[in-house]
Amino acid sequence: MDIEKSDKWTYVKERKVGEGTYAVVFLGRQKETNRRVAIKKIKVGQFKDGIDISALREIKFLRESRHDNVIELVDVFSTKSNLNIILEFLDSDLEMLIKDKFIVFQPAHIKSWMVMLLRGLHHIHSRFILHRDLKPNNLLISSDGVLKLADFGLSRDFGTPSHMSHQVITRWYRPPELFMGCRSYGTGVDMWSVGCIFAELMLRTPYLPGESDLDQLNVIFRALGTPEPEVIKSMQQLPNYVEMKHIPPPNGGMEALFSAAGHEEIDLLKMMLDYNPYRRPTAQQALEHHYFSALPKPTHPSLLPRKGGEEGIKHVSSDLQRQNNFPMRANIKFV
């Protein structure tokens, strides 16, 4: 991949906000515009075969994915020892908002975040890119409330049958077919993650928090019941399939747990968390669901609750240290 040459003096490093095994992240500014940016300095010398593949993927896919709901790749340039990726700086994310119990989520807030998530996802899927690591702390929030997909280090292109890794997507947001070793998949894996995020926005806590890969399947089955025989039959063809004892759906179904949700929310959630990945809606089909046309209308991004500033910068830093690796991470009107 050709790396565009840029004058390294175009950017001023202000302070380090995080460090992983292969990268250091600085808060900085673009000299000419005084714009705040995040500067990822990737230590090229750490990789005997050149640059880490996740860095190249992030650059490639962000170049192909310019959209209001995808983090902007501002610039890329290299020095003798580092590859420098310049990104727009976003000091808040959806996880911060979910965890802040002093912030009250209104149904219109949740609908707005879901619209922006699905719009960004539809955009990358239309360019045959799977994200493969959707979760609340990879959904960043701008100063004017716009949600943006970030952290494309696990992304890859799709379209023709290929042998893809099943060891992707953070456990709590990973669909069951990947635990069973499925290596040929499409947009359905991202849509399962979106369903888990939708549930988390309504519950204000992770919906399917398994403690291990094996436990994760048990958590999913206890929450949704075991799959129907037709789906089990297709799962039996997967290399890591494990026999499962029948578990019925919980009493009252999803409606009992999501008691504040309406029929539209429950219907969309069930579609996204379908065991059959081919029955899960695409991002565009989800945007066309009647949930988004029903009242209330989604809140305008500028009116959404948000956090940021120093607290957000500290969160970015601690998140990168926890990962200890590179990288960090429909026609609907708002009212």
Swiss-Prot record:
Question: What are the entry keywords?
Answer: ATP-binding, Cell cycle, Cell division, Cytoplasm, Kinase, Nucleotide-binding, Nucleus, Phosphoprotein, Serine/threonine-protein kinase, Transcription, Transcription regulation, Transferase
- The name this protein carries in UniProt is Serine/threonine-protein kinase crk1
Disulfide pairs here are none
Question: From the UniProt record, which GO molecular function terms apply?
Answer: ATP binding; cyclin-dependent protein kinase activity; cyclin-dependent protein serine/threonine kinase activity; protein serine/threonine kinase activity; RNA polymerase II CTD heptapeptide repeat kinase activity; RNA polymerase II CTD heptapeptide repeat S2 kinase activity; RNA polymerase II CTD heptapeptide repeat S5 kinase activity; RNA polymerase II general transcription initiation factor activity
The species is Schizosaccharomyces pombe (strain 972 / ATCC 24843)
Give GO terms for biological process: cell division; positive regulation of transcription by RNA polymerase II; positive regulation of transcription elongation by RNA polymerase II; positive regulation of transcription initiation by RNA polymerase II; regulation of cell cycle; transcription initiation at RNA polymerase II promoter
Cross-referenced SUPFAM superfamilies: Protein kinase-like (PK-like)
Q: Where in the cell is it found?
A: Cytoplasm; Nucleus
Q: Which residues carry this modification: Phosphoserine?
A: 162, 165, 318
Subunit composition and interactions = One of the nine subunits forming the core-TFIIH basal transcription factor. Interacts with mcs2 and tfb3.
Catalytic center residues? 133
